[in-house]
Amino acid sequence: MKIKYLLSAGALVALSATAQTLQTTQKGDTTIIKVENPTKYLILPIEEERPEAQLQLYSGKATDTWMDVRLAVGKTDYCVPFALTQGKEAVVKIVGLPKDAVALKEMKLSDTFDTTNTDYYRPVYHHTPLYGWMNDANGLTYKDGEYHLYFQYNPYGSKWGNMHWGHSVSRDLVHWDHLDPAIARDPMGHIFSGSTIVDTRNSAGFGKNAIIAYYTSHSMRNGKQVQVQCMAYSKDNGRTFIKYKGNPVVTPFDGLENFRDPKIFWYEPTKSWYMIVSADKNMRFYQSKNLKKWTYVSQWGEGFGACLLYTSDAADE
């Protein structure tokens, strides 16, 4: 079955000056959506109680990543934006969505997304994302007059999933500007919690004062958790991050499933960087001179811990 829509400038579903063509092809449980002259977003209708379908912005590259989205089948509870590649064509693949799903009829193209919130009980003083789901605060740092708040974030629903690092900045810790997600889920897995540093020494060679993020990549293989530590660096004051090609930088030497939440700090007496990782019932320490190659040092503690916050009187962060 093929469905073809011609969307012109000024139409409700397209705010671009160039006409967009949206073509949908379905075969079995797979839907292919081709958009010519794509707008910034494909607006996705969501139905909370439906099972997740798998959605992917397809380019044929190894970096293509599936997102789990509760696309509307019977009714639309709300909508979320899905960013499209800019150029002549964007291709979106969906697996697990019925042919008669409401989402296929109501999805729209747009260059904007209305983030106005009308929920009476929505917090005003405490930070919340414009839309989606959040929990752990990650990578809290200060640079050039800005406080950076990264956080666990699902931009495609109000439940846990598709872990990204969301990002907001503030100059007073009260008023926050919401930015695009800084680090997105990728083929290595969800982007779990971690920390950031400002590399004032240029230890990693990405440039003096580059912001470097360390996070846990989480995936499931053969029914077991796989958690490894990765790094990404930013040269534009934390707005966007480039994932290090040598990831992962730390893996559990004994195959632990619970191995996450890296915290990085500088220890002046040894003139080294240290990483502390929650390793099941212990905390493991790793040492590095260049922030890329890490050597296991020791472990400490008994009992389960996560999202560690460790400082030293000799630390210089």
Predicted feature descriptions by range:
Residues 151-177:
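Beta-propeller domains
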Residues 25-28, 63-82, 102-138, 157-160, ...:
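Surface loop/turn signatures of beta-propeller and other carbohydrate-active proteins
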Residues 146-149, 206-213, 271-274:
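Entry beta-strands of beta-propeller and related beta-repeat scaffolds
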Residues 42-43, 84-96:
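Noncatalytic modules at the cell exterior or secretory-pathway interfaces
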Residues 310-317:
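Conserved small/polar residues in nucleotide/adenosyl-binding loops
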Residues 24-36:
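Short beta-strands within extracellular/lumenal beta-sheet-rich domains
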Residues 1-21:
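Bacterial Sec-dependent N-terminal signal peptides
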Residues 60, 170, 234-235, 285-291, ...:
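Conserved Ser/Thr-centered positions that define the repeating blades of beta-propeller domains
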